[in-house]
Amino acid sequence: MAQVSMRDMLNAGVHYGHQTRYWNPKMKPFIFGARNGVHVINLEKTLPLFNEALAELTRISSNNGKVLFVGTKRAASEAVKAAAVDCQQFYVNHRWLGGMLTNWKTVRQSIKRLKDLEAQTQDGTFDKITKKEALMRTRELEKLELSLGGIKDMAGLPDAIFVIGADHEHIAIKEANNLGIPVFAIVDTNSTPDGINYIIPGNDDATRAIQLYLDAASAAVKEGRGSNVEAELQIPAE
């Protein structure tokens, strides 16, 4: 069972919040105190919440659920992509386009265009058009890949989103709320826990902390996917 320990979180600096003057009072239940003008997150609150979230991610994945990893801050971007790829799920790590979930029909058209352009790079189309046109299409492809590359094979809305940095990704959270998609999110002391189904109070800036969250979430998803495969193998042939 995918779990984290108190020692793991301490070593990764999960307990370091933001400066006290930037705090959101709604995070008070999860704050232990302050040290040198910086809030300290109560890891005795975080630990059970995080492990509960991991168990639910495993359950969702065991039912073939799709998990969308979201983290567009510079500190999280590459790690978000790596974690999603590692567990064969989906990601948005560059910029959240408004309507990415709530206007899925339009996003799907953009994904179709992305795949068409990818096909053109392989089937010789680019050799048959002018260099200027080929350059324009290449730039369009690069732009679409940056925005939509992580969801181009998602084939429908996700069953959950796992967010690094609730404050930074508030638009994604709001869209998920509007559609009833469960939200799992790392919530720092300057953020609001509103609209988050699975609150994980913790540092959302430190690279080591971000890596800890993503490694654990990816492991939980892989565990769920593995149990699903095992269940299928045990179904007797008719």
UniProtKB/Swiss-Prot annotation:
CDD domains assigned: RPS2
Leader sequence residues: none
Annotated InterPro entries: Ribosomal_uS2, Ribosomal_uS2_bac/mit/plastid, Ribosomal_uS2_CS, Ribosomal_uS2_flav_dom_sf
Entry keyword set: Ribonucleoprotein, Ribosomal protein
NCBIfam families for the chain: rpsB_bact
PANTHER family: 30S RIBOSOMAL PROTEIN S2 PROKARYOTIC AND ORGANELLAR, SMALL RIBOSOMAL SUBUNIT PROTEIN US2M
Protein name per Swiss-Prot or TrEMBL: Small ribosomal subunit protein uS2
